[in-house]
Amino acid sequence: MDKKKYIITLDEGTTSCRSIVFDKQAKIVSVAQNEFTQYFPQSGWVEHDPLEIWNTQLSTMQSVKNKAQIKSVNVEAVGITNQRETVVLWNKETGLPVYNAIVWQDRRTSEYCETLTKHVDKVREKTGLIINPYFSGTKIRWILKNVPLAQKTLKAGKLLAGTIDSWLIWKLTGGKVHATDVSNASRTLLFNIHTMDWDQELLDLFEIPRSILPEVKSSSEVYGYVEPSLWSQRATAKVPITGVAGDQQSALFGQLCLKPGMVKNTYGTGCFTLMNIGEKPIMSKNKLLTTVAWKLGKKKPVYALEGSVFIAGAAVQWIRDGLRLIYDAAESDFYANLASKQDTHQVYLVPSFTGLGAPYWDSYSRGAIFGLERGTKKEHIIKATLESIVFQTNDLIKAMSSDVGKKIEVVKVDGGATRSEYIMQFQSSISGVNVIRPKNIESTALGATFLAGLAVGYWKDLKELEKLVKVDKEFKPKLDKEKVEKLVHGWNVAVKRTFNWMKEVDLK
């Protein structure tokens, strides 16, 4: 029988659940992935079914173990990384949700957020965040105010709330552990990033009882144990859950951005640029967020500056599934290169389908395409879609550079869209940075794997990890300065024209 030990990491994303088996060399042994349903009950609303997420995640965990042909006794530890801000409220006796999960992209609390303008500075100082529908606090409040079953369950003392990591930990441990990690907690608007605890003043502001919230732990410690029967009927192994981090912080760790000033960008459904800023939180002057990156056991927490783009890879999904301009995301590079060769006119697509994230934070912006001419073909729209991902990321890189007072030279990248050579090269040229793509672009899952492994001594220290991450390709800037300035200027004009759209036309 195989006596080797492995780590299984559960990577619960916005559109799919995956489980990955990693070995001691941080190599992927097997992967299982299944998509789950997206619900859009009203304009600007986005929901998931928490039970579907749980069942999907569980089935990938079971099948990835079987694919790797290992038993639960071969699993040293489990890591969890997850879509952040998305919230679930459930009954602790029945284990059933009282409402669908409200997803990070959901904008239903926009108007409520506007009523809190006088609290903006206080909230920012305590949490490092801005008041925005994106974060968990206003979503939890909405469920408590609008869902009778939530109110009834709360009155009965049976209600629990949490982000997706908490929901999965609770289910995996058979309801024994209600916990979250510092990186996920720091995305709720309820967590004080200086005291590293839930903040009573913020709980009062958002009218959320502390009793329903999870215990906050470090990102790398023993949380509890996976119920043996979840692996298989005959399993008896006690496998600990030892690494937990929100997806973007997990990717920062997985890219080994361990020193202040190191930057990574993840190209997923959205785009997320994070910079390690060390053990002291810096507040951005450019509307970036300050967030907890991770905390290793009893060590001091590490902080990050973060810029979030809501729609990145999701824009490519839209031209594939909504507009049907392509059959497969992989085709988009071909069409973008085709349009580049024609170089007749520049089209800009601003994919603010759910508003704009950093550094604009405009909930009322909506998507638009600019520069259309009679000669515009589908390849121009496809090229503009890919370039929109780059322009949005460039906005974040420039804001970060300004906040820390020095030019960013290198950006490490990961996520699905890094497979696009067009996006990677254009990013390097537009931002004037060297873009480094690692061999293993699964940095998000790798981060939680490293966190889980460190907690149980699977890897002994950070030095050992540094030998495990290998570079696939480095992209260097190719466009001249004048061309870049012209392209970026056009993007800036296009973005501004989408501001406040929903408010001005009042299309609710």
Swiss-Prot record:
- Keyword NAD carried by entry: no
SUPFAM superfamilies, alphabetized: Actin-like ATPase domain
Entry binding sites for ADP: 14, 18, 269, 313, 416
Q: How is its activity regulated?
A: Inhibited by fructose 1,6-bisphosphate (FBP).
PROSITE patterns given in the database record? FGGY_KINASES_1 (PS00933), FGGY_KINASES_2 (PS00445)
Q: Which Pfam families match?
A: FGGY_C (PF02782), FGGY_N (PF00370)
What protein family does this chain belong to? Belongs to the FGGY kinase family.
Q: Which UniProt keywords apply?
A: ATP-binding, Glycerol metabolism, Kinase, Nucleotide-binding, Transferase
| Binding-site residues, glycerol | 84-85, 134, 247-248
Q: Which gene encodes it?
A: glpK
> What does the record give as its pathway?
Polyol metabolism; glycerol degradation via glycerol kinase pathway; sn-glycerol 3-phosphate from glycerol: step 1/1
Gene Ontology molecular-function annotations: ATP binding; glycerol kinase activity
Give the protein's function.
Key enzyme in the regulation of glycerol uptake and metabolism. Catalyzes the phosphorylation of glycerol to yield sn-glycerol 3-phosphate.
Binding positions (ATP): 14-16, 269, 313, 317, 416
Q: What is this protein called?
A: Glycerol kinase
Stretches that traverse the bilayer: none
Q: What class of enzyme is it?
A: transferase
- Kindly list the biological process annotations in GO that this record carries: glycerol catabolic process; glycerol metabolic process; glycerol-3-phosphate metabolic process
**Enzyme Commission (EC) number:** 2.7.1.30
> What residues does sn-glycerol 3-phosphate bind to?
14, 84-85, 134, 247
- Organism, scientific name: Mycoplasmoides gallisepticum (strain R(low / passage 15 / clone 2))
* GO cellular-component term (any): cytosol
Question: What reaction is this protein's catalytic activity?
Answer: glycerol + ATP = sn-glycerol 3-phosphate + ADP + H(+)
CDD domains in the record, alphabetically?
Answer: FGGY_EcGK_like
